[in-house]
UniProtKB/Swiss-Prot annotation:
Residues 124-340 are annotated as: Domain III, AAA+ region. It comes from Geobacter sp. (strain M21). Residues 1-83 are annotated as: Domain I, interacts with DnaA modulators. It comes from the Bacteria. This is Chromosomal replication initiator protein DnaA. The lineage of its organism: Bacteria, Pseudomonadati, Thermodesulfobacteriota, Desulfuromonadia, Geobacterales.
């Protein structure tokens, strides 16, 4: 039976990322099996809950794929004996039945407290957000390095760590990566990841139901507190008051605090001065919008994770057309992947332009036929008048056809309108030119790169 589990692990390794597999599957140990149940050992109760919630169905499928049989999975926590029926002890003579009931009630209360503690220890991290899946570049290198330093040695040099930057630049990814890294090293670590809004809502509910002591104890016993979008606490005096005392309690206990915001602490209106000063005690790291090269790397990383073939020219097209928001990039990639999957087509540059025409519109609507003619003429060192002429020599025909192709791709001009701009040529000549360039680009990578180089010049 152990061989079945080993084969199932091999199956899981092929479908999960290396980080996910090493964190959540590799630590599972085969203990034994019955006819229809496989018993696995887990490092901790939290680990058991996380694997049960996130990966149990996948584990069952992987096991079933080995021999076609379905098994139940039973987890045993390491260093904990499997639950057995309580040993019957001789009762002390004359112990009243009422006292026995009280003892039972006390045991039940202890069990409830244990369950409550388990729930509080669930960190709410996104397992997909790891350092391995984060693409670092010049725009985020400082924040990335600082986050790794905190994850490797929490509550030492950089406490608190304050990460700020615009929407969709990777702040949430980094704070989750810190939590996942620490949790992988120490599954028993008490980690809490909250948005500031969730912190505030939970505090309000605790006030309403008179459970503030529980609320405070929950946060102040953490080893790592991760708070996302702290700017939403601005102007909320009661929430800031409570967070201030939570911050102090954790800091004095040498526990790590990581906070994110869309602004530098001093630029957050409505944030109390005492909180600002606390944030400045540690390290403040910013994330800037990524450049084109970093955006291309992000797209390639995401496509590899999804097992999708994304050609370099398509990645460049998306990177140049998107704003600097990484979420927008991901949305474009998902849209392109979905279209390719549903239509059964390979992803190509022409497909990307068609699928993204309503998204990447701002980058193209200001491009005119005249701009394209001028750029192509300069690239080939010829005159615009020669480009528009009827001369049939090769040194003019190819540049002319390239210019016509780019006009069709980047402007809203019709075939007749383009023909008019090129010395009154008829629409059939324009169509022929477009098809000619498309065919040559499909079979000649060097030629294709030359055309793309001209396109780039139009956006710089």
């Amino acid at each position: 039976m152990e061989n079945i589990w080993l084969e199932a692990q091999t199956n899981l390794k092929q479908v999960l990322t290396e980080q996910t597999y090493s964190t959540w599957i590799d630590p599972l140990k085969f203990l034994g099996a019955t006819v229809d149940t496989i018993v696995l050992e887990v490092p901790s109760s939290f680990f058991q809950k996380w694997v049960t919630d996130k990966y149990l169905a996948m584990i069952k499928e992987a096991i079933s794929a080995v021999n076609g049989k379905s098994y139940q999975i039973e987890f045993h926590v390491a260093d904990e004996k499997p639950e057995a029926a309580p040993e019957e002890k001789p009762e002390k003579e004359g112990k009243p039945a009422r006292e026995k009931e009280k003892d039972k009630d006390k045991e039940k209360e202890k069990d409830r407290e244990k369950e409550k503690d388990k729930k509080e220890l669930v960190p709410n991290l996104n397992p997909k957000y790891t350092f391995e899946s984060f693409v670092s570049g010049p725009s985020n290198q400082f924040a990335y390095a600082a986050s790794q330093a905190v994850a490797n040695k929490p509550a030492t040099n950089y406490n608190p760590l304050f990460i700020y930057g615009g929407v969709g630049l990777g702040k949430t990814h980094l704070v989750n990566a810190i939590g996942n890294h620490i949790l992988a090293k120490n599954p028993k670590a008490k980690i809490c990841y909250y948005s500031s809004e969730k912190f505030m809502n939970e505090m309000i509910n605790s006030l309403r139901y008179k459970k503030m002591d529980e609320f405070r104890n929950k946060f102040r016993k953490m080893d790592l507190l991760l708070i996302d979008d702290i700017q939403f606490m601005a102007g909320k005096e009661a929430t800031q008051e409570e967070f201030f005392h939570t911050f102090n309690a954790l800091y004095e206990s040498h526990k790590q605090i990581v906070v994110t915001s869309d602004k530098f602490p001093k630029d957050i209106p409505g944030l109390e001065e005492r909180l600002r000063s606390r944030f400045e005690w540690g390290l403040i790291a910013d994330i800037q919008p990524p450049g084109v090269e970093t955006k291309v790397a992000i797209l390639k990383k995401k496509s590899d994770m999804h097992a999708v073939n994304l050609p370099d020219d398509v990645a460049l097209f998306l990177a140049e057309g998107a704003n600097s928001n990484i979420r927008e990039l991901e949305g474009m990639l998902i849209r392109l992947e979905a279209f390719a999957s549903l239509t059964g087509q390979e992803i190509t540059l022409s497909m990307a332009r068609e699928v993204m025409k309503d998204i990447i519109v701002e980058k193209t609507r200001d491009i005119t036929v005249e701009m394209i003619q001028k750029t192509v003429a300069e690239h080939f060192r010829i005159k615009v008048s020669e480009l528009k002429s009827d001369k049939r020599i090769k040194t003019l025909v190819v540049p002319r056809q390239i210019a016509i192709y780019i006009c069709r791709e980047l402007t809203k001009a019709s075939y007749p309108e383009i023909g008019e701009k090129f010395g009154g040529k008829d629409h059939s000549t324009i169509i022929h030119s477009v098809k000619k360039i498309e065919k040559q680009m499909a079979g000649d990578d060097e030629f294709k790169a030359s055309v793309e180089d001209i396109r780039k010049k139009l956006f710089t």
